[in-house]
Amino acid sequence: MNNVFHAQTVGSPEAAQRAGIGLHLRAAIVLAVLALLALVAGASSSCPPATQRLYRQVVILGDPHLPGRHLAAKEQVRRTINGWRDVDLVVAVGDICDTYGTPAEYTAARSFFERLNHPLALVTGNHDYIYATPSRPDSGDFYPASPEEQADKLARFHQTFRLPALSHSRMVGGYLFLFVSADHDRYAVGIADRQLDWLRTELARAARTPTIIVFHGPLKGTQHPFKRYINKPHSVAQPVEAVQALLAANPQVFLWISGHTHTPATEASYASPINLYDGRVANIHNTDMKRETIWTNSLLLYPDKVVVKTYNHRQGAWQPELERVIRPPRF
């Protein structure tokens, strides 16, 4: 009994102290190692801030058609883009609403984009304003809305996304972006006179700044007729003559970003020499999001070039065969 008691009263305090020191030391070492691993992992997964990058990235969303079909695929696209840390701006090229630009569609669109973690710029498409909402929204009827109904829907677009104006401008990485909303009362993808006047004014102010125009409709003749309506009046930016004259008078415009024609990345017209308008302005066509396989284009804006990269969201991979390099004009 005495030996046992002696071990507990004399030997135990020192042993316990040594054991305690050892435990604290091991815990400190473990914590230090974990902190170091977290630091290394964070450094490898993060992206340099914009001030340290050589480029700015603008991600283009083709016609979202919200809520519409394949909503789960659209939400996966948003989650993927949210995970890209080098995104400076996300642009949606019109047809934000699925069909008629109803209040319910605008509510769904606002909810969708509120969960985007990057700055957003949008323009209108024909489905956002031009069609009259039928008594049965599932009827599939498409008739021009009255001027009053069109104006109400354009105002709803403006208010829903808190835009400075339906058409607006923004500088990104030394490039001027002009976001032009379709607002013509007759053409499906038309620019009304007041918007054309705004465009002329903006371009006159920036005659020596490389400029990119974002508009829902493509430029005429920049696609092969892979569908019967391609290059027809209701499928190209209107008025054709006014648009052509505007571009001819402003050599600083070198890129035109569009949607509307639902051009998939598997179509030859998606990335082709035919995309060059009047030998000078490259039209970048974008796939709609109303499908299981969604592609998005990214514009990587360098001081001396724009690299266009295409991402297949179903495969979770970039498609290097579609990569293009476009040089801005020099003044």
Region locations from a protein language model:
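Short, low-complexity, charge-dense intrinsically disordered segments
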Residues: Q8-A19, L25-R26
